[in-house]
Design a protein with these regions (language model features):
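DNA-contacting interfaces and partner/effector-binding or oligomerization modules
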Residues: 1-71
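Alpha-helix N-cap/N′ positions at the starts of helices
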Residues: 34-38, 49-53, 104-108, 118, ...
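Interaction interfaces in information-processing and related assembly proteins
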Residues: 56-98
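A short, Lys/Arg-rich alpha-helix, primarily the initiator
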Residues: 90-118
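Recognition helix of helix-turn-helix/homeodomain-like DNA-binding domains
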Residues: 131-147
Length: 174
């Protein structure tokens, strides 16, 4: 959009808004998802000041806060001087990542609950057999922290072993 001032002899100057003669530099990308834009287009979008484009970037960041677009935005924000949008996008990334990490801890907690249930062991016995304290297991189950990958493997193996023993006991006629 361009702004033009028209001056007339008898009247005060008037301001006329005219459509820009050139299409937006982002026009080539408008129909593509933001996730498929090159970094140069992300940079242009951040610098352009177009709210609708920023909204699309925010949606992409929330959808995948560690994905390609997030990395591109981080790269652009290192060099761009758009403080307002830069601060906002940084905040979106930070919050989206925190929410994702909380969701992942909750998912791990659900998996641990299922492993304990499947094993037939009490929580205390399960914790003892995987080599953690009851408090540590409680922290895993509350999604406060996540166990290491090695601990998850140990939990799955323990659950498998006790589930197999439980199945064999119920399969035997007494």
């Amino acid at each position: 959009m361009t702004l033009a001032v028209e001056a007339h002899d008898d009247a005060a100057p008037t301001v006329r808004l005219a459509a820009a003669a050139q299409p937006s530099s982002l026009a080539a990308y408008e129909k593509k998802p933001v996730e498929f834009w090159p970094t140069a287009a992300i940079r242009l979008a951040v610098e352009s000041g177009e709210l609708e484009v920023w909204k699309r970037i925010v949606v992409a960041l929330k959808r995948d806060p560690y994905g390609r677009t997030a990395r591109q935005v981080e790269e652009v924000l290192e060099t761009v001087s758009s403080y307002g949008i830069g601060k906002a996008l940084t905040e979106v990334l930070s919050r989206s990542r925190a929410e994702l990490e909380a969701d992942e801890r909750a998912e791990v907690a659900r998996q641990i609950h299922a492993l304990i249930d499947r094993s037939g062991l009490s929580g205390r016995e399960f914790a003892s057999r995987i080599g953690v304290s009851g408090d540590d297991l409680a922290a895993f189950l509350a999604a406060d922290v996540s166990p290491s990958a090695a601990q998850m493997v140990r939990m799955r193996r323990l659950s498998d072993r006790f589930a197999k023993m439980k199945a064999q006991r119920t399969a035997r006629p007494e």
